């Protein structure tokens, strides 16, 4: 039986998606660097501010004390692993392939920052009067939403397999 190919299971669409997402991430970071004051909140709406800061580590500033090339190596290993998963995943799994594309785009967006500046530019802050979430960026959002898409795909696949057994 022939598997139906989803859009992001093909190399050209995934490459275009990644390039467009990477360009959007880098353009926004350029604007943030050019116009947003450093470590001063600019309220956008209740509980959301723009707040430019630099992350010298990985997610939530973990590993910020590590050598920069070690972190670059980790990011390259993640991209390589996700590409490997993308190639091995059945071609009919739309959300998984979309998730892989988003994770790759996000990892590359932060990798470009790391290579150019030695840190990642973060600028989105959710907060209340007594609490604030870690400052993050569009690339981080791609990674998070991409992981969610992969989990959704797994849940849908499990449901599909259960319904076929009935």
UniProtKB/Swiss-Prot annotation:
Keywords: Aspartyl protease, Cell inner membrane, Cell membrane, Hydrolase, Membrane, Protease, Transmembrane, Transmembrane helix
Coiled coil (residue ranges): none
Any one Gene Ontology BP term: proteolysis
Molecular-function GO terms, alphabetical: aspartic-type endopeptidase activity
Gene Ontology cellular component list: plasma membrane
N-terminal signal peptide: none
Magnesium recorded as keyword: no
Active site residues according to the UniProt entry: 122, 140
Subcellular localization(s) per the UniProt record: Cell inner membrane
Catalyzed reactions: Release of signal peptides from bacterial membrane prolipoproteins. Hydrolyzes -Xaa-Yaa-Zaa-|-(S,diacylglyceryl)Cys-, in which Xaa is hydrophobic (preferably Leu), and Yaa (Ala or Ser) and Zaa (Gly or Ala) have small, neutral side chains
Keyword Hydrolase: yes
One matching Pfam family: Peptidase_A8
InterPro entries in UniProt: Peptidase_A8 (IPR001872)
Segments traversing the membrane: 12-32, 66-86, 92-112, 138-158
Main subcellular location: membrane
Metabolic or biological pathway: Protein modification; lipoprotein biosynthesis (signal peptide cleavage)
PROSITE patterns: SPASE_II (PS00855)
Family of this protein: Belongs to the peptidase A8 family.
Functional description taken from the UniProt entry: This protein specifically catalyzes the removal of signal peptides from prolipoproteins.
The protein, known as: Lipoprotein signal peptidase
UniProt organism field: Rhizobium meliloti (strain 1021)
């Amino acid at each position: 039986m022939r598997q139906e190919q989803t859009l992001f299971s093909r190399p050209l669409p995934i490459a275009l998606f990644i390039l467009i997402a990477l360009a959007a991430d880098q353009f926004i970071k350029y604007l943030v660097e050019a116009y947003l004051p450093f470590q001063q909140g600019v309220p956008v709406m209740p509980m959301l501010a723009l707040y430019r800061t630099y992350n010298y580590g990985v997610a939530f500033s973990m590993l910020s004390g590590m050598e920069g090339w070690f972190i670059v190596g980790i990011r390259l290993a993640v991209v390589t692993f996700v590409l490997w998963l993308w190639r091995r995943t059945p071609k009919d799994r739309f959300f998984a392939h979309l998730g892989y594309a988003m994770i790759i785009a996000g990892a590359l967006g932060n990798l470009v920052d790391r290579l150019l500046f030695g840190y990642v530019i973060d600028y989105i802050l959710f907060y209340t009067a007594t609490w604030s979430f870690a400052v993050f960026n569009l690339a981080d959002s791609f990674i998070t939403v991409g992981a969610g898409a992969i989990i959704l795909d797994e849940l849908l696949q499990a449901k599909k397999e259960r319904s076929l057994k009935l």
